[in-house]
């Protein structure tokens, strides 16, 4: 006798197997150069670096204000930045699985949204605890966007047979210049 839970578990296993198969087929197509590349793919991968570069630069410029606003010393600020790094490392550990299940584009968009939203929340926080929690989520956005954008860049570079990685990372730097820019 099959229970409802067994049936839903089987359906989930079938869905995961299908997703894994399609991702593996896509990887084989990329490796055998059976996939064409468009300028939209290249621009999308560039944007995947530009946007995180922008909000990371905004964060860097915001650190002195945050320190003064919360009246904290370097030790507390260092601990808060450590929490940001922990969020980033944890998200990098699962980024490959997320990309495998949902694709680079969706993961980069989600990560950019998480990064920008959490940075906006950091600016509104008035306590150390809430700011630290928001920085943890900011780290998640930074880590996810970095790992998934680099994976997309690698795939795009392999298909196009051009050396694009320097240009993509240049996009991160351009985002860093554009982020804190004010007229």
Where do the protein language model's features map onto the residues?
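Primarily marks hydrophobic transmembrane alpha-helices of the MFS/SLC 12-helix fold
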Residues: 105-108
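Pair of pore-lining "gating" transmembrane helices in MFS-fold secondary transporters
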Residues: 38-62, 136
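Paired small-residue
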Residues: 129-137
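Helix-breaking motifs and short loop linkers at transmembrane-helix boundaries and internal kinks
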Residues: 71, 103, 124-129
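Intracellular juxtamembrane helix-capping segments at the cytosolic ends
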Residues: 144-158
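C-terminal ends and interior cores of transmembrane alpha-helices
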Residues: 113-126
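Helix-to-loop junctions at the C-terminal end of transmembrane segments
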Residues: 91-103
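Short hydrophobic/small-residue motifs within alpha-helical transmembrane segments
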Residues: 85-86, 173-174
């Amino acid at each position: 006798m099959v229970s409802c839970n067994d049936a839903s578990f089987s359906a989930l296993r079938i869905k995961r197997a299908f997703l894994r198969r399609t991702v593996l087929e896509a990887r084989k197509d990329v490796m055998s150069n059976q996939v064409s590349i468009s300028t939209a793919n290249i621009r999308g991968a560039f944007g995947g670096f530009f946007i995180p570069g922008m909000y990371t630069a905004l964060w860097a410029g915001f650190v002195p204000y945050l320190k003064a606003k919360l009246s904290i010393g370097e030790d507390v600020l260092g601990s808060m930045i450590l929490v940001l790094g922990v969020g980033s490392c944890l998200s990098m550990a699962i980024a490959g699985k997320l990309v495998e299940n949902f694709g680079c584009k969706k993961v980069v968009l989600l990560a950019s949204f998480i990064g920008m939203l959490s940075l906006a929340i950091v600016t509104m926080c008035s306590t150390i605890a809430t700011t630290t929690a928001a920085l943890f989520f900011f780290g998640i956005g930074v880590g996810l966007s970095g790992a998934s954008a680099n994976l997309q860049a690698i795939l795009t570079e392999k298909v196009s047979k051009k050396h694009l990685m320097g240009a993509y990372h240049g996009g991160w730097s351009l985002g860093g210049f554009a982020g804190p820019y004010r007229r």
